[in-house]
Regions:
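Glycine/threonine-rich phosphate-binding loop and adjacent beta-strand/alpha-helix elements that clamp
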Residues: 255-288, 592, 613
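Flexible glycine/proline-enriched surface loops and loop-helix/loop-strand junctions
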Residues: 7, 21-25, 57-62, 278-288
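Long, well-ordered, tryptophan-enriched scaffold segments
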Residues: 1-50, 138, 143, 299
Length: 655
């Protein structure tokens, strides 16, 4: 409805939905000073006009909630309404908590996706390949090419065993079954199944769930039910030594634990992807010590041994193992370059690397492990030399003058630096900001200073988002499990009621009814706690807590609290304090600061305290109690991320 008058026009639906969100109500819910809040809104809303731009940068403070996905949706809607998507200086930009989180999600270390964000098939909806392609292929937009992406993926996955007669091996691809949803296979879900005896073996690849998992004490108890545990890591982490935790009895734990020394990032070659989707190649700095191996080599050796056992002994259904295309070798040796060829894609007949994903086909003539990366390693003439591939480019020239640096590494897809850059122009192809131009319609063609994120053969129209079937942005989205438009909910544990609707917590939040969450109330736990990082430590501290000079800077865990709360509780800076709730109890040092301040939430004075998540009992130097013993194992229904950022505790000066 171009007149925006129809009551079912999305913009009008949004207006009605958010009528309750008055400035006064928002200030009451959030505890923000109303004048400061209005000033922020006014300044940022000023970016919503031609020649202006505003960027939203966010991190785990927005995502680690039971409504984290909707937080991101809300920011997306703000940026779309202001015209800040696809323009120079705009965007909704994630500040990742790890160097290669982007790469990990790209290659599908998450539950619901295959590599390249192809949906993982479900047994009920996608029984056959035709069912999958019918359900997942868009009628218009670039995902109308999904059959090319999926068939090429299957062709790489099963190689010569993927034929048109067997649907390119689709029947062998594991499906999400009807009995257990995808959430059951997330980090939190797997520990519930460990507790219940449904999972008997566990691999921890460069992760430390005995420390990092929410409600970590619950996770450690669940691990005690395992028959075996394999840890591939740099140091003996809390997970590798979980039976030594202060709250565990080693005599009662029969789990067989195998520790595989893994190579550090500096001790192996490979690519790393940042938040800008730049896939950057890294050379090996030094050889790994002793028996340490890269994750790639460990997986390859393990798979070869497993396949050998299936060949000798058979099994219930050995085909997916025996027919998998897992021979990533060069001259008979495991070689990551062969993985790069598989990811980039190649023609099946002659093995030549593809220039990019535009060459993918749905007839089995091309193979490609991850379509979005196609083109990142495409120099066929020097395919054995990573340093002569697009991913290793290091040009410092920037003809755009806007920080695109298109000759530095490779940005997926197609070396496109800014997604949705068609939105930087009006419907006639004229840039909103003539001084900063990504793309521009001149005469009878598009001039491109960045790779166009649209069908550049077409003249200007109103289609700026060609990864959706309608090729428009979505203010109203049917892709979210918890609703088409963001709505406010309180955390799983909250000091207040929900002032905006009758449901206190997000109704679709995961695991909220699980018996081991042990929800607390303000009657027993009156203070809101949040977790965060410090510059001097890294994640669970496996590496940084083994470096002496870093631990001279931050040597122990602490609770950060306001001067007002410290005075009320008789706590001084440096005191040892006890912090506890229904899930656990920890002793840490007090850090009294003005950074933490009481807030007026729904007219009530509310204290907030904060605690880093880096410390626990294992480590060479700095050790201590684990703050994640207090966090609840509940999560977002879309991203499955835990709610580390808000929960209830009590605090007192330790005896």
């Amino acid at each position: 409805d171009m007149t925006l008058e129809n009551p079912l026009c999305v913009l009008n639906v949004m207006k009605r939905h958010y009528d309750r969100y008055t400035p006064e109500m928002v200030a009451k819910v959030t505890g923000m000073d109303p004048d400061v809040m209005m000033k922020i809104w006014q300044v940022y809303a000023g970016t919503g006009k031609p020649g202006k731009a505003g960027a939203l940068l966010y991190a785990l403070g927005q995502t680690q909630h039971t409504y984290g996905g909707q937080n991101c949706r809300a920011m997306s809607i703000v940026q779309l309404l202001l015209g800040n998507i696809g323009v120079p200086g705009g965007g909704l930009n994630a500040m990742r908590g790890e160097p290669n989180v982007q790469g990990a999600t790209d290659v599908a270390c998450t539950v619901p996706d295959l590599p390249g964000y192809l949906k993982w098939p479900t047994a009920k909806k996608h029984r056959h390949l035709a069912d999958y392609l019918h359900a997942e292929t868009y009628a218009d937009g670039y995902y109308s090419n999904k059959p090319k992406f999926m068939v090429s993926f299957l062709k790489e996955f099963f190689g010569e065993n993927a034929t048109v007669e067997n649907d390119y091996g689709y029947e062998m691809l594991p499906k999400i079954g009807p009995r257990l949803p995808a959430s059951a296979w997330t980090t939190m879900g797997t520990f519930h199944m460990m507790r219940d005896g449904r999972i008997k073996g566990y691999f921890a690849w460069g992760m430390n769930p005995a420390h990092s998992t929410p409600n970590a004490k619950f996770a450690r108890n669940a691990m005690a039910n395992l028959d075996w545990l394999v840890c591939a890591d740099w140091f003996p982490t809390e997970t590798a030594t979980f039976w030594k935790a202060p709250d565990m009895d080693p005599a009662k734990i029969q789990t067989e634990v195998y520790f595989l020394p893994a190579a550090l990032i500096y001790e192996k070659i490979g690519s790393i992807s940042n938040s800008g989707r730049w896939v950057q190649w890294r050379q090996q700095g030094v050889l790994p010590p002793g028996e340490a191996k890269s994750d790639f080599e460990i997986i390859e050796v393990l798979f070869d041994r497993i396949r050998s056992l299936y060949q000798k002994e058979g099994g219930v259904y050995p085909d997916p193992i025996l027919k998998a295309n897992m021979d990533y070798k060069v001259d008979g040796k495991y070689d990551l370059r062969a993985v790069c060829w598989a990811i980039n894609g190649y023609t099946v007949q002659d093995g030549k690397l593809l220039p990019g994903y535009a060459q993918l086909q749905a007839d089995g003539s091309t193979a490609c492990g991850m379509w979005i990366y196609s083109g990142y390693y495409n120099n066929e003439a020097d395919k054995l030399d990573p340093m002569k591939q697009p991913t290793a480019r290091r040009s410092k020239e920037d003809p755009s003058g806007m920080g695109l640096f298109s000759g530095w590494s490779f940005a997926w897809p197609a070396n496109r630096r800014v997604l949705y850059n068609r939105a930087s122009c009006d419907m006639k192809g004229r840039p909103w900001n003539p001084e900063k131009v990504f793309v521009e319609w001149k005469g009878d063609k598009w001039l491109q200073y960045d790779v166009g994120d649209f069908v550049t053969a077409n003249p200007p129209d109103n289609k700026a988002f060609f990864m959706t079937w309608e090729q428009n942005a979505r203010l109203f989205s049917y892709a979210m499990a918890d609703g088409p438009m963001p709505e406010h909910y309180e955390p799983f544990e909250s000091p207040t009621k929900n002032l905006l609707n009758d449901s206190v917590q997000a109704p679709c939040a995961l695991f909220t009814e699980d018996k081991d969450n042990r929800r607390g109330t303000t009657q027993d736990y009156p203070y809101v706690c949040t977790t965060y990082s410090v510059t001097e430590q890294w994640q669970t501290g496996a590496q940084t807590r083994s470096i002496p000079w870093l631990n001279e800077l931050i040597s122990c865990n602490f609770i950060e609290l306001s001067e007002e709360l410290a005075k009320e509780k008789g706590i001084k800076n440096g005191d040892t304090v006890r912090v506890w709730n229904n899930r656990g109890s920890v002793k840490v040092r007090a850090m009294v600061t003005i950074r933490m301040q009481p807030m007026q939430i729904n007219g009530k004075l509310t204290h907030v305290v904060g605690m880093p998540h880096h410390f626990s009992w294992a480590g060479s130097f700095a050790t201590g109690d684990n703050g994640n013993d207090l966090t609840p194992n509940v999560g977002d229904p879309v991203s499955f991320i835990p709610e580390y950022k808000a929960f209830l505790v009590n605090i007192e000066k330790a005896a």
